[in-house]
């Protein structure tokens, strides 16, 4: 008979308790991922038209997204410090508040300056949110199971896009901006709700790995980031295409709501399948075909007057982009030192790459669209993405599980 004093009983209960905490935290992370990205996608697809209505041209609409991304990038290097001071629950809740509250002020903003100011505040929240999501999720699972965990996290992100992006366009075309902004604030509230799945305190969600974290020096940072360079470059290029597609397809194609819905839907399935393939075969074997499919789908954005071709391209873009996100994130995490500090640093680097690419695409795409139209913008973006495969890859991660 096992009594409560039996060490085996205490150990078993500890394992059950730890598993319940992990499930609770992962569930909270998925709720937060859905809410945060639903809010993000609603406004990403609606605000360009709102900015144009306020007197800005395509370049002004692109600059609005670029402001959001610039603010996001500015806060991300400080997120490990923030997580250590506030803890996971409070950090995630803060990100939801910063992401959602400015949305309520958007109906009163009618100038590009005011819109950029609110976008900057939202960018602070988004920057904290995206680093928290991928870092906290990764910390919950050992390296061998991260592909599927990241796949599920990415699926939640994709479902948010399936609902958020087309709905934002549809509401903008009805000029139902007040409803759009209220929905963006409400879905951001789910980030705050999801934060309660995490325990109080500042400790990592799982014990630190066997490697001790390097001190944060310029030399140490470069050494830790150097093995990640290849996946990070691919991430920047792929999200540049993402910024172009999701900012400018709504301005160039009448079938934009259907196209973005198709892209987001295919991305959900691709993230789940890619997670399984990555755990089985390694991220590098998934990455190359995923990049090529993304480039092909991006080029199809030039078919603004051919709905069938545009929709087919959108399906390809979503499938390729979803797989690229899962593969690059897993590869970056594999290149990091195990432990909370190393994984946190990798999470920051990957998210900076994501947001930098999105900002580059939305900012540079406006002048290119004005100069050459869709036939110049989308194929040029696709060619730049595909050309990156010609760049020699960096050395393999020190503790990669490739080639299983």
What are these regions (language model features)?
Residues 120-157:
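Cytoplasmic helix-loop-helix junction between adjacent transmembrane helices
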Residues 128-141, 323-338:
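Intracellular juxtamembrane helix-capping segments at the cytosolic ends
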Residues 69-77, 161-162, 264-268, 272, ...:
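Residue-level signature of mid-helix packing/kink "hotspots" within the transmembrane helices
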Residues 186-208, 391-395:
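C-terminal membrane-cytosol helix-exit motif in multi-pass small-molecule transporters
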Residues 87, 108-113, 282, 304-305:
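Helix-breaking motifs and short loop linkers at transmembrane-helix boundaries and internal kinks
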Residues 90-104, 185, 285-299:
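Structural signature of the two symmetry-related core transmembrane helices
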Residues 75-87, 270-282, 369:
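Helix-to-loop junctions at the C-terminal end of transmembrane segments
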Residues 9-23, 200-233:
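Juxtamembrane intracellular "pre-TM" segments in multi-pass secondary transporters
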């Amino acid at each position: 008979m096992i009594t409560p004093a039996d060490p085996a009983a205490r150990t078993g209960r500890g394992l059950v308790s730890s598993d319940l905490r992990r499930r609770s935290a992962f569930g909270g992370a998925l709720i937060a991922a859905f809410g945060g990205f639903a809010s993000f996608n609603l406004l990403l697809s609606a605000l360009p038209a709102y900015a144009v209505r306020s007197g800005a041209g395509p370049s002004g609409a692109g600059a609005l997204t670029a402001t959001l991304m610039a603010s996001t990038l500015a806060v991300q290097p400080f997120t490990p410090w923030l997580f250590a001071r506030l803890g996971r629950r409070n950090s995630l809740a803060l990100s939801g508040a910063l992401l959602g509250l400015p949305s309520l002020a958007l109906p009163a903003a009618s100038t590009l300056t005011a819109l950029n100011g609110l976008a900057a505040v939202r960018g602070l929240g988004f920057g904290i949110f995206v680093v928290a999501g991928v870092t906290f999720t990764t910390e919950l699972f050992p390296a061998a199971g991260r592909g599927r965990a990241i796949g599920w996290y990415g699926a939640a992100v994709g479902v948010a896009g399936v609902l958020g992006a087309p709905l934002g366009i549809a509401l903008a075309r009805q000029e139902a901006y007040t409803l759009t902004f209220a929905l963006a604030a409400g879905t951001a509230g789910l980030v705050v709700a999801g934060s309660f799945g995490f325990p109080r305190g500042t400790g990592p969600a799982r014990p630190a790995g066997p490697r001790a974290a390097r001190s944060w020096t310029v030399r140490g940072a470069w050494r830790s980031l150097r093995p990640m360079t290849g996946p990070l470059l691919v991430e920047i290029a792929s999200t540049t295409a993402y910024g172009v597609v999701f900012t400018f397809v709504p301005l160039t194609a009448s079938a934009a709501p259907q196209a973005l819905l198709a892209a987001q839907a295919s991305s959900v399935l691709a993230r789940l399948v890619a997670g399984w393939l990555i755990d089985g075969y390694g991220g590098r074997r998934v990455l190359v075909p995923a990049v090529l499919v993304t480039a092909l789908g991006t080029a199809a954005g030039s078919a603004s007057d051919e709905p069938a071709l545009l929709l087919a391209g959108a399906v390809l873009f979503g499938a390729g982009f979803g797989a690229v996100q899962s593969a690059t994130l897993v590869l970056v995490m594999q290149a990091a030192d195990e432990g909370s500090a190393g994984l946190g640093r990798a999470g920051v680097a990957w998210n900076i790459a994501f947001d930098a690419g999105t900002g580059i695409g939305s900012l540079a795409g406006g002048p290119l669209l004005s100069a050459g139209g869709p036939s110049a913008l989308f194929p040029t973006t696709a060619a730049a993405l595909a050309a990156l495969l010609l760049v020699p890859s960096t050395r393999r991660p020190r503790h990669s599980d490739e080639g299983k």
